[in-house]
Design a protein with these regions (language model features):
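Repeated loop/turn-to-beta-strand initiation elements of outer-membrane beta-barrel proteins
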Residues: 67-73, 108-111, 143-147, 183-189, ...
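Residue-level signature of outer-membrane beta-barrel architecture
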Residues: 45, 61-63, 103, 117, ...
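Solvent-exposed loop/turn segments connecting transmembrane beta-strands
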Residues: 45-54, 85-91, 119-127, 143, ...
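Outer-membrane beta-barrel "beta-signal"
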Residues: 242-254
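Cleavable N-terminal export/targeting peptides
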Residues: 1-33
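Short glycine/proline- and aromatic-enriched beta-strand/turn motifs that initiate or cap beta-hairpins
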Residues: 20-72
Length: 254
């Protein structure tokens, strides 16, 4: 706790946020409770072709049946404005709902199924829907170090709100690698990397990288800093290939 008090003023200087929420980063590694919920409040900044300053709220609820079943539901909403020199600020919105179930098959192997619906004004996605399934396996599980790998397939529907409205339907392979490290009683670090290529178009792929540092205040609250990066090799219309987001906010556990 002394370490946290020393570093707290530095953390509060970085009140900037990373709006792309990634469901794997919000997964609770402590599965003792059968029912648990958490809420995140973040303030942030993201940069691609434009700069956006925003505020983000995320709610998550998990249900655990130890050594058998894990399900969770996430709701996320983000409101911000796009700032350009000598131009009127533009209001931007982003949000999604995500549901996932993981069924344990063996001690270190589970089967997952998931679905999601959302929208993203920042990259002109009017509506995005997807569903899929896959496997999740533990690579290493120790008290202060945990690593997981997941892989599967998903069907993705995207409707774009560009000058000319268009729709894209793709089947994608999705995989991710998760690393979670406890660096002390009040400090932890996690990294999640996704790779999502289209099955029919090998050059249409996305790479998502999420990094988070979490400072524990007490059993019911944390301060989080995240630095995330997204690369889309074949973005639609005039969207940039890459953008990054920086996030600093508070997490309440109940």
């Amino acid at each position: 706790m002394n370490f946290f008090l020393k570093i707290l003023p530095i953390v509060l200087l970085f009140q900037i946020s990373f709006p792309q929420v990634n469901t794997e980063s919000m997964r609770d590694f402590d599965q003792k409770n059968k029912l648990a919920s958490k809420a995140n409040f973040d303030f942030g900044y993201e940069k691609s072709n434009d700069e956006i300053f925003d505020i983000l709220f995320t709610f998550r609820s998990d249900y655990y049946k130890p050594k058998n079943l894990h399900s969770f539901f996430i709701l996320s909403y983000q409101n911000g404005f796009k700032s350009k020199l000598n131009e009127k600020n533009t209001i931007m919105n982003k949000g999604f709902g995500h549901f996932r179930i993981t069924k344990q098959i063996f001690s270190n192997l589970g089967v997952e199924t998931f679905s999601q619906i959302g929208f993203n004004d920042f990259i002109s996605i009017k509506e995005r829907k997807l569903f899929g399934s896959g496997i999740r396996t533990a690579i290493k599980e120790e008290m202060n170090f945990k690593s997981f790998f997941g892989a599967g397939f998903m069907k993705e529907f995207e409707e774009y709100d560009d000058i000319v409205s268009s729709t894209k339907i793709l089947n994608r392979f999705t995989s991710y690698m998760t690393v979670n490290v406890n660096m002390g009683q009040d400090l932890s670090f996690s990294n999640i990397t996704y790779y999502q290529p289209a099955i029919s178009r090998i050059y249409d792929y996305r790479v998502l990288v999420f990094n988070e540092i979490k400072f524990k205040i007490n059993h019911f609250s944390n301060i989080n800093i995240t630095i995330n990066y997204r690369f889309d090799n074949e973005p639609h219309e005039n969207s940039g290939k890459s953008y990054f987001e920086i996030n600093n906010g508070f997490e309440i556990i109940f």
